[in-house]
């Protein structure tokens, strides 16, 4: 049966229609014949037209209306497979194309499937680039530019302060991308964005508007320990990383949001070594001396004591933490094990109920003083407290020059892998997907691969990078890279090869592969859908030069199916068909 609306099939998710459907589920009577009854909606929200003339707090700029409208226009592009690297069954993707269009194209297939969006966008310093969107036909504009039909056109341009629209240009680039990418996040998903002082204030306002202030997780300050040399005022030596979750209630329900104490293993190993070689008494003194010399966090430095069993611990108060007094049974005295006399009780009572106190006594987790005059503390063993709250500070003054040199990859000012890992690790669980649509040299993918190697997180990544030409003066160009996306693809491939070589045992358990796609105009003019829900496409319905593989991936995108599903060629009743996802979808071959 031929579709009466072939155009609908060759576009991405219709966001306006999707939003209207969501609205109709909440307020059914506000949607009539597919249109929104604004008056009815205002009544449901407790608003009347009298409010129109009232003054509201609003963050706006020239072009904001067009930026919002651009998010509601579906893309008429698709993705075309270019090459597979490594594991054929990989779930990792590297997509070459304008990230705005790519995010639109992924709306159906990856809606609410991404756990972390992690981006490092242009900071708008006046030297970096800002993407130039053509809201009327962004796909046509992109393809004309990348095929150099107009050699004078550019994918992006330096956003210099003399344009008179310095902040406006940046806002018009960022707002629509941040808006539609939110749809891809899981309910408990998180977005993390690197930024410096140039646009921090504006980014915060955008994020509060799109995500809501109540969903803000906070700002992490990355202290680079190296002040900027070109500053005209205060010399900044830090960047900021803003974190917002999609739904704070879902996030808290499903995420502990704790990070591994980075140096806990070192502390335990040092204590074990000292006890073994110096004895318990000397080990206690030397551990404290050693800890004072280390650049550890405050939470880690608190663990500098060794108990009779050789275990590292810290003392913690057992006093009731609230201003109000604890219940009556929280005032039962603890008896000193030597003097057999009652120890002092905290003024507002103990922190724990009697049953917990009994268990702590039994497990030797209460610390008594020399006699009954000292109030007891609780013993926190380091081995049982290997996680800590995520700090608002990251101290890292190094670079990845050595890592990139080892891989023989060149790129100016990449993110630092170890910093990326500190952001990704406390947020993501096994099998989560990390999306970076300002991929650059693919540092985020590099960090994901190292996390997978180190703790078998089994994370997957989707990298998106516009094929921006590299200037001939740069070292990367001299090494043979013509596009920024070339650098990212080569880097990911080399990191995976390195892991295979250095860690063959774990390599077999990891997803060491990725598939490269690039953005393209649609292959399909019209389509036919059979009664059995399979799809038939005839050569007459196709654009020139497309392959069966191109058609299959476009159908997956239109059906909202994962691009990494297995595809097998089969023969059914003498006809060649493609079995997608082990029977999830059958596509008739156009050569049958």
Give residue ranges: language-model regions:
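Conserved S-adenosyl-L-methionine
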Residues: 61, 133-141, 171, 198-200, ...
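Short, solvent-exposed loop/turn and secondary-structure capping segments
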Residues: 106, 126-136, 203-205, 231, ...
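Conserved proline-anchored active-site loop of SAM-dependent methyltransferases
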Residues: 112-130, 207, 434-448, 556
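Conserved Class I SAM-dependent methyltransferase catalytic core
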Residues: 150, 157-220, 462, 482-504, ...
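PRPP-dependent phosphoribosyltransferase catalytic core
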Residues: 450-592
């Amino acid at each position: 049966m031929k579709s009466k609306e072939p155009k609908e099939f060759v576009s991405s998710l219709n966001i306006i229609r999707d939003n209207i459907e969501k609205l109709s589920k909440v307020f059914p009577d506000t949607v009539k014949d597919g249109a929104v009854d604004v008056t009815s909606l205002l009544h449901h929200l407790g608003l009347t037209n009298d409010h129109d003339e009232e003054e509201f707090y609003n963050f706006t700029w020239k072009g904001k209306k067009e930026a919002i409208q651009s998010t509601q226009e579906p893309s008429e592009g698709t993705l075309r497979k270019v090459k597979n690297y490594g594991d054929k069954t990989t779930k990792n993707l590297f997509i070459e194309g304008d990230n705005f269009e790519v995010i639109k194209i992924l709306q159906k297939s990856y809606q609410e499937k991404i756990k972390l969006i992690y981006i490092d966008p242009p900071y708008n310093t006046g030297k970096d680039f800002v993407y130039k969107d053509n809201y009327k036909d962004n796909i046509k504009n992109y393809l004309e530019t990348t095929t150099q039909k107009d050699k004078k056109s550019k994918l992006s341009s330096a956003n210099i302060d003399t344009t008179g629209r310095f902040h406006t240009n940046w806002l018009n680039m960022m707002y629509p991308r941040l808006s539609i990418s939110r749809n891809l996040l899981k309910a408990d998903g998180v977005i993390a964005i690197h930024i410096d002082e140039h646009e921090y204030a504006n980014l915060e306002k955008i994020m509060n508007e799109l995500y809501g202030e109540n969903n803000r997780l906070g700002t992490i300050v990355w202290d680079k320990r190296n002040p900027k040399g070109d500053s005209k005022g205060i010399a900044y030596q830090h960047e900021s990383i803003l974190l917002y979750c999609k739904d704070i209630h879902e996030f808290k329900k499903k995420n502990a949001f704790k990070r591994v104490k980075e140096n806990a293993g070192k502390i335990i190993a040092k204590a074990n070594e000292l006890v073994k070689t110096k004895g318990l008494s000397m080990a206690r003194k030397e551990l404290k001396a050693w800890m004072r010399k280390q650049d550890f966090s405050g939470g880690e430095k608190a663990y500098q004591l060794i108990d009779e069993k050789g275990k590292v611990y810290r003392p913690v108060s057992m006093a009731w933490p609230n201003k109000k007094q604890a219940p009556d049974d929280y005032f039962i005295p603890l008896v000193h094990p030597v003097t057999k006399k009652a120890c002092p009780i905290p003024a507002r009572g103990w922190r724990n109920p009697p049953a917990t106190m009994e268990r702590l006594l039994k497990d030797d987790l209460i610390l008594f003083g020399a006699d009954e005059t000292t109030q007891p503390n609780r013993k926190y063993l380091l081995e049982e407290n290997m996680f800590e709250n995520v700090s608002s500070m990251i101290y890292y003054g190094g670079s990845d020059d050595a890592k990139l040199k080892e891989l023989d990859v060149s790129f100016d000012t990449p993110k630092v892998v170890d910093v990326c890992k500190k952001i990704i690790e406390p947020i993501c669980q096994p099998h989560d997907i990390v999306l970076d649509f300002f991929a650059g040299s693919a540092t985020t993918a590099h960090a994901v691969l190292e996390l997978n190697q180190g703790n078998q997180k089994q994370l997957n990544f989707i990298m998106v990078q516009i094929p921006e030409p590299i200037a001939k003066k740069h070292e990367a160009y001299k090494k043979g890279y013509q596009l920024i996306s070339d650098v990212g693809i080569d880097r990911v491939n080399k990191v995976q090869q390195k892991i295979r070589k250095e860690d063959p045992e774990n390599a077999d358990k990891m997803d060491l592969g990725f598939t490269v796609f690039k953005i393209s105009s649609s292959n399909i003019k019209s389509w036919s859908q059979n009664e059995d829900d399979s799809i038939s496409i005839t050569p007459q319905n196709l654009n020139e030069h497309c392959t069966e593989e191109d058609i299959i991936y476009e159908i997956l995108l239109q059906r909202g199916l994962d691009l990494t599903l297995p595809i097998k060629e089969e023969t059914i009743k003498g006809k060649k068909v493609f079995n997608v996802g082990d029977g999830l979808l059958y596509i008739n071959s156009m050569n049958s």
